[in-house]
Amino acid sequence: MSTKTSREIALERRKAMSDGGKKAALHSSSTKDRVRSSQDINSTGATSSNKKVLTSPSKSNIPANKIARKSTSSKLSSKELGIERRKAMSTHGKSAINSSDRTRTDVKSDIKVNKVISTEKPQALKDHNNNIKDNQVVKQNIKRRINQKRKPITNTSRDIVLARREAQSKHGKSASKQNTSAASLARRGDPDLSSREISQRVRELRSKTGSTSKQGNGKCRPCGPNKNGSKLNIADASWKVGKSETDSGQTVTGTQANRSLKTTGNEASTCRTVTGTQYMGAEVTGQFCQDKPKYKQPIRASVTTTTSGNKVTGNEVGRSEKVTGDEPGTCKNLTGTEYISANQSKKYCGEVIKKPSKVMQSITTDGLKVSGSLPGRSSLVTGDESGSGKQLTGDQYLGSEPSPKGKSFEKVGSYDTLNGNNVTGTGVGRSDYVTGNEYGSCKNLTGDEYIGSQQYEKFCGSTPKPEARKVGLSLSSKSNLISGTMTGRSKIVTGDEPGSCKVLTGTPYAGLDQINDNCNAEIADDMKSRATVNSGNNSNARLTGLQPGIGGVMTGATKGSCKNLTGTPYIGGDQFLSNCETPPNDASYANQEKSASNSWKEFSVNSPSREKYSAKNTEGVTGNRYEDSSKITGPFDMAEDKVTGTEQFRFEPNKNMTYKQKMKQEESQNIDIPTDKKEPSKITGEGQSAGNITGDDWDRGDKVTGTEGVSARKRNPSRAGFMGAMPPVDNKRNDETEKPDFLITGSSGNTRDGQLVTFSGGARG
């Protein structure tokens, strides 16, 4: 038990903090003495500071396990409960508070104070126990009535708010959706009420306040069908704010006080002339009166026009025929604000003298409006002639009427370069008003062009040629824009003529403008037709294999089959032409192989049942097709004079013919075929049917050997067969051949008399 007063404990604590800081204050004796029990109240309160007990201070603290943390409210008084609570909080903080509800109970038992074990001497403990016994007042049990006096509920806002708060503290937000009737409010206030007591309170409330205390549960009131049919008359209901027109032509809005057929007693004075403000519409007199009444009162607010054209509204104060004495000064010119209308001056004076306006409107030379006091030159003012005809820089504040000769200087100019580009900004070119900038004004400079072509037209006799564009624009054969450094054929560069007018496979890097400028019309049309635009699945090329074709027996494939789709084309051009009426692209195929000479049906193996099925459906889904022949035997699909394999290798049926026989047959075919018809393609698959093949820069010709033609058929068979399948070896070509017209640049030179190179046969001089 502490024997020090609170003042002594505070002084010791402050001294310890000044010497060692906050950590020293935690281990000081004053901190231990701050834990006080219920017995310290009487001892410290009875002993004054003048009469100190000369006892040694207790150095041992009360053990924490001996402190009664849990104390019931039924055994301690409110004062002792407060002391125990504060003592527990000073030792363990807020975690020592374990009481869930601080509401006191109605019945209290005898006060029993827990004994606090102290470590003081027995004599001091005995003295303190005597003091506690003398000062302790034993309270007897007081019997209270459990059933309190019933208080009638009154449906006031305070009771509703209290009940709502209590319900929300228990049930949360869901309590706001509960019923708010008188019975529910009574049950919330006292949950222990019986149904008989609740009904008594409700009847008592209704006897005082009537049926106004009845409240639903927030739902809509029940309503049945409208038997009277008032909903049909909603369109004919009267509007709260009406609109009518007076006899003078003005519009009046608001609550209509007009005569109505549904109202009796307002017939009197309907058709009479009434003085004052007219608040009845003209439609009333037209409906109920035979003769329209004449209103003799003048219009309070009139609208007149001044000599400058401005409108003036308000009380008209001009000259009148009904007023005498206002004739003097009618036709005189007055200074100041004009409040007399121009109509009055024209009526009595015969002419209207236009007066100058304070605020004027004008238009600049650029078409912008300027309003305000125009400080332009006037014939009535002398001394403003100086500089009136000169051209000024800056913002234009004069109108178009007093504008000087010429146009004012613009801050931001617009110029055109030699290439046709537009340049805006402050002009830095040559000017008549600046001297010293003549040098080099007519010379052609390299670099960015920031001077407009107007300077050359004004100061120089001729316009220089524009420089080559750094970034050019061209149009590819597939209608795509190509921008960047132009790598096509140029008139300034020599040696780029070969191959410029030939069809190349791969990505086009030269535009159509190069073809139109350097090639003839026939070659240009040929190159354009071979490089058709393929949009989506609308490709001109035939496709073989497992493909979702259109036009067959499969249902559901016709939807969207004739539309342009993006992505990889999976429908051939032949299917597109046969099923769609108007294909979006050219009907010519990319691979110039005619169906007459190379039929697609020649490359398939069909059984009799298959042929019968193909006669019924010729546009179905295709698969791996082989040569159409009934002589194919063996496990490797080999036949007489044929080599099977992929579709990229097609060979002539007669390979046992000699070279001369083949040449004669080709000449006879060339005579029969017209010149416009092009020979069938020798390259199938990914390559084009004619033209140059990019890559290692080799050209196709009649005198050049390579990976195609008769020699290729001998040297590169797809599969090695038996000896009977190989044709005999033909004699080598040793006849004199004509020299080609084209030149091949590189190691062979660049002149026409230079060496001619064939890729398979080596160099030839």
Swiss-Prot record:
Residues 38-63 have a biased composition (Polar residues). Residues 1-215 are annotated as: N-terminal domain. Residues 735-765 are annotated as: C-terminal peptide. GO terms for cellular component: carboxysome. M-repeat repeats lie at residues 240-289, 300-349, 358-397, 411-460, 470-519, 530-580. N-repeat repeats lie at residues 7-22, 79-94, 158-173, 196-211. It comes from the Bacteria. It holds the Pfam family CsoS2_M. GO terms for biological process: carbon fixation; photosynthesis. Keywords: Bacterial microcompartment, Carbon dioxide fixation, Carboxysome, Photosynthesis, Repeat. The keyword Repeat applies. Required for alpha-carboxysome (Cb) assembly, mediates interaction between RuBisCO and the Cb shell. The protein is probably highly flexible. The C-terminal repeats act as the encapsulation signal to target proteins to the Cb; they are necessary and sufficient to target both CsoS2 and foreign proteins to the Cb. The N-terminal repeats of this protein bind simultaneously to both subunits of RuBisCO. Probably also interacts with the major shell proteins (CsoS1); that interaction would increase the local concentration of CsoS2 so that it can condense RuBisCO and full carboxysomes can be formed. Has 3 domains; the N-terminal domain has 4 short repeats, the central region has 6 longer repeats. The C-terminal domain has 2 repeats and a highly conserved C-terminal peptide. The C-repeats serve as the encapsulation signal for the alpha-carboxysome, and are able to target foreign proteins to this organelle. This is Carboxysome assembly protein CsoS2. It comes from Prochlorococcus marinus subsp. pastoris (strain CCMP1986 / NIES-2087 / MED4).
